[in-house]
UniProtKB/Swiss-Prot annotation:
GO terms for biological process: translation. This is Large ribosomal subunit protein uL23. One of the early assembly proteins it binds 23S rRNA. One of the proteins that surrounds the polypeptide exit tunnel on the outside of the ribosome. Forms the main docking site for trigger factor binding to the ribosome. PANTHER family: 60S RIBOSOMAL PROTEIN L23A. Disulfide bonds: none annotated. InterPro entries: Nucleotide-bd_a/b_plait_sf, Ribosomal_uL23-like, Ribosomal_uL23/eL15/eS24_sf, Ribosomal_uL23_CS. Part of the 50S ribosomal subunit. Contacts protein L29, and trigger factor when it is bound to the ribosome. It comes from Vibrio vulnificus (strain YJ016). The keyword Acetylation does not apply. GO terms for cellular component: ribonucleoprotein complex; ribosome. Keywords: Ribonucleoprotein, Ribosomal protein, RNA-binding, rRNA-binding. Belongs to the universal ribosomal protein uL23 family. One of its GO terms (molecular function) is rRNA binding.
Length: 100
């Protein structure tokens, strides 16, 4: 069993972008930035326990950090792991709910 402390460290933040918003509307999929060492089972357990929803599937990917320059100095942004979490039919999770 995964500890409560580990579940809180797995999910970093929701990833809000145009592509993520379209995925949420069309496929009932939520995108999260997650810890680099997180597994799909840990991500599924964390979402189900923290948000009280049922997860259908989890797809993960690692986006490589971009190379950036400032004058003569060159640096690199960190790599980020993202998880596309598809919820079961009838489940809903809204991060960007509009004010009424």
């Amino acid at each position: 069993m995964i500890t409560q402390e580990r579940l809180l460290k797995v999910l970093r933040a929701p990833h809000i972008s145009e592509k993520a918003t379209m995925a949420a509307e069309k496929a009932n999929t939520i995108v999260f930035k997650v810890a680099k060492d997180a597994t799909k089972k840990e991500i599924k357990a964390a979402v189900e326990q923290l948000f009280e929803v049922e997860v259908k599937s989890v797809n993960t990917l690692i986006t490589k950090g971009k190379t950036k320059r400032q004058g003569l100095r060159q640096g690199r942004r960190s790599d980020v792991k993202k998880a596309y979490v598809t919820l079961k039919e009838g489940q809903d999770l809204d991060f960007v709910g509009g004010a009424e």
